[in-house]
Regions:
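Extended acidic/polar alpha-helical scaffold segments
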Residues: 113-114
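Membrane-embedded, lumen/periplasm-facing catalytic core of multi-pass transferases
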Residues: 1-109, 123-134, 139-170
Length: 171
């Protein structure tokens, strides 16, 4: 039941990666940065960056680039060095962002007219579903809570959905 819920309700971040063109460019994440599935889904010529959003904590940092010459562990040059731009307070680091104008593609739940959707998938909005359930009688609250975590046929009508999109800059 849990696995089914994960695939049906929360798979959109992986699904949209299949629509990413196999060409060089910059894929940007805004408010949905924490749902980035993995670099395994991104073509090697695509660089992943972040654009400024309402989030004010620390964002992931890129590994150092260098010459991967060690045949046993080619990532040694990248992983054996201590990063210099980290803090232990989860403090905002402005150097983690790029300008939106540098982005070829954007992953977000909404955008203005300068972007066109390449692929959008439905995605359960946990916070909105939880808030909506607070106004319901107790049995409906329980149903909505269970429906977010486990797939129970027919119970997904108590969930609030939104679109999770891969967007391309309009020409």
């Amino acid at each position: 039941l849990r696995t089914s819920a994960l695939v049906l309700y929360y798979h959109a971040p992986i699904d949209i990666m299949h629509a990413l063109p196999n060409e060089a460019g910059t894929l940007c994440y805004a408010g949905e940065w924490h749902r980035f599935p993995s670099h395994f889904f991104v073509p090697p010529q695509v660089r992943v960056e972040f654009v400024e959003s309402a989030f004010r904590g620390i964002l992931p940092h890129h590994f150092r680039r260098g010459n991967a010459s060690d045949p046993l562990w080619p990532w040694a040059a990248y992983t054996r060095t201590s990063p210099t731009h980290v803090n232990d307070r989860n403090a905002h680091e402005p150097d983690r962002y790029v300008a939106l104008s540098q982005c070829s593609w954007l992953v977000d739940t909404h955008a203005d007219d300068t972007w066109e959707p390449l692929m959008c998938r439905p995605f359960v909005d946990n916070e909105a579903s939880r808030l909506a359930a607070q106004t319901w009688p107790l049995p409906a609250k329980i149903r909505a809570t269970v429906a977010r975590a486990l797939y129970v046929p027919g119970w997904d009508d108590s969930l609030v959905w939104r679109s999770y999109c891969l967007l391309r800059r309009r020409a």
